[in-house]
Amino acid sequence: MAIALVTGGSRGIGRATALLLAQEGYTVAVNYQQNLHAAQEVMNLITQAGGKAFVLQADISDENQVVAMFTAIDQHDEPLAALVNNAGILFTQCTVENLTAERINRVLSTNVTGYFLCCREAVKRMALKNGGSGGAIVNVSSVASRLGSPGEYVDYAASKGAIDTLTTGLSLEVAAQGIRVNCVRPGFIYTEMHASGGEPGRVDRVKSNIPMQRGGQAEEVAQAIVWLLSDKASYVTGSFIDLAGGK
């Protein structure tokens, strides 16, 4: 069929999305930064179920590594048809007055620059004017982009606000090139990311404030991502789906 690249595909939302895309017939490129074992586990689950997958190591904040990752995809016979920009980082909960430039820049380099670089390389390959066959991109933002994450991680929230704007701008740039660009904004999902923020049980702490009174599962986000990438969403671009239980 075609290749779908999932950045940060070894855990959480990325993992769930990779598994679901394989079920839809994509050959899945599972990107990871550090945990080769986890990425290989995803690949093995896919191949054992009769699907196709391969793993690619890259730190998306590093331009050379991003270019190398897409060059590796070019070596495969199938074209790149889908990009899920999912890799992201989050640091320990902290107020703005205690943030350092180093922390802010690390968050932005992965969560913003990394997304831009992956979009750039995907567009080069998908655009009709470049001989591509079109494609679809889904950026994984966060409901934090409009809630702001006060007292927790405004830096992370701001990085996701940038992704919302990237989605809008890029969708308009490439709509005539056969490329659709959409965005999901998860919130309060049971993933390992909350441990990175220093509070593994955060979802359970805040779920009473969520209108639906529960946290979400990575698979619920994956369903929305896969729909946006599919032909069922063929007239959808520049759109946002919030998956945050009503928040």
From Swiss-Prot:
<dbReference type="InterPro" id="IPR002347">
    <property type="entry name" value="SDR_fam"/>
</dbReference>
<feature type="binding site">
    <location>
        <begin position="4"/>
        <end position="28"/>
    </location>
    <ligand>
        <name>NADP(+)</name>
    </ligand>
</feature>
<dbReference type="Pfam" id="PF13561">
    <property type="entry name" value="adh_short_C2"/>
</dbReference>
<dbReference type="InterPro" id="IPR036291">
    <property type="entry name" value="NAD(P)-bd_dom_sf"/>
</dbReference>
<dbReference type="GO" id="GO:0016614">
    <property type="term" value="F:oxidoreductase activity, acting on CH-OH group of donors"/>
</dbReference>
<protein>
    <recommendedName>
        <fullName>Uncharacterized oxidoreductase YgfF</fullName>
        <ecNumber>1.-.-.-</ecNumber>
    </recommendedName>
</protein>
<keyword id="KW-0560">Oxidoreductase</keyword>
<dbReference type="InterPro" id="IPR020904">
    <property type="entry name" value="Sc_DH/Rdtase_CS"/>
</dbReference>
<feature type="binding site">
    <location>
        <position position="142"/>
    </location>
    <ligand>
        <name>substrate</name>
    </ligand>
</feature>
<feature type="active site" description="Proton acceptor">
    <location>
        <position position="156"/>
    </location>
</feature>
<comment type="similarity">
    <text>Belongs to the short-chain dehydrogenases/reductases (SDR) family.</text>
</comment>
